[in-house]
Amino acid sequence: MAASDPTNALLREAVRRLAPVLPLLTELGSRFVDAGHEIALVGGPVRDAFLGRVSPDLDLTTSAGPDQSEAILAAWADASWDVGRAFGTIGARKGDHVIEVTTYRADAYDRVSRKPVVAFGDNLLDDLARRDFAINAMAMRLPSLEFVDPYDGLADLALRTLRTPGAPEVSFGDDPLRMMRAARFVSQLGLTAAPPVVTAMTDMASSLAIVSAERVRDEFVKLMLGSAPRQGLALFVETGLAAHVLPELPALKLELDEHHRHKDVYEHSLIVLEQAIALEGPPDGPASSVPGPDLVLRLAALLHDIGKPATRRFEDDNGVSFHHHEMVGAKMTARRMRAMRFDKDTTKAVSRLVELHLRFHGYGDGEWTDSAVRRYVTDAGPLLPRLNRLTRSDCTTRNVRKARTLSRIYDDLELRIARLMAQEQLDAVRPELDGNEIAEVLGIAPGPVLGRAYKHLLAVRMDQGLIGREAAAEALRGWWAEQPESDTVT
């Protein structure tokens, strides 16, 4: 059957994308064929070439065993190494390209742990049959460049759909992590999961519990960093996967009362995420622009309101409140991210942004004082560029006048921050006298009283800005005269 126009377009794009590496691939392919083996480019690099994307990896599969692959690569590449001989994988570098060659696999899966029982195969088609999705079960034989697509993965790419090579229940039963990969590919590649895939994910979501938290986290991170995380998250939530990984997310689907006294928090959170992504800077931009994709900003946008279900209260005036939801949410964020095995720095940054996301609104609608600006910047610290974007994103009101007012106030705040930063080092605000100088002025030794004195001068610095060392010393003496301990110092 003749290829459709979309398929032909994809084929042309693949040839164009692979052109820079085709000489290298055909050279390596000839080495393997001359030694009596089959070899093919497989999986992600083939898929990405059809999508017009440059894949950083060159993954190949071969009939050669790992010892044979290692011998061929050692004689051809600039360097070679053992990636995972037990899994049949040998790595190599040729020029600027990194290559991984893996022996055909015909794994079975342990019925309890679902971990693969590694077995090497003897033909390409069997290897492709065990792959997770049809779009990843495409290959290009080398050096002939024959395209092999037994499960119509190319047609799936043209239709932007995601299917498994065989029955999805069998595929997900073999490795439940593939359900997370489905949500990730929806986010990364803008695909739609086929109905049988969605059904199987829904029926088998609970089996994800046997997969390690680290593996699940890695797929979730890739989902969040994709080009369409909202779509991936929707699949993640609707199939029930989220209930086993991030239950706080579906919990945001608060049941609205008959008066609809608050917005849909789940929908609001997804909109905030999309708006935060729109404010990310280019990948090669300065840190102040928050180069995208930025995991910390995206996680904070998604989770900023997770404290609302626990703090929702219906008031007597038919209103609804979520008092202190930012504080509750920060603790919930840290707890969940630790359970998902996120690193400490990322966990701390995301939970701090959740805690600070209402700070802008705490200053009211009036003009910001210099003191308020200093405290805002100091509280945010190095997270300020992200907090700026999170705060701007957290405006999903349909009231155009209100949205314009908030935008104007925030524009003014950013101007104020820029002006003060030109005059002062706002990202490292400290008193104009250090601890030793405070002790000398007051005639006291290090201890709790000195700490209180330091905090007082820091408050003076916040409220009044740079007033000079003499004025700071005078303010310190005035404060000291009111302290009970001053009577005991001679």
How would you label these PLM feature ranges?
Residues M1-T490:
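Catalytic cores of the polymerase beta-like nucleotidyltransferase superfamily
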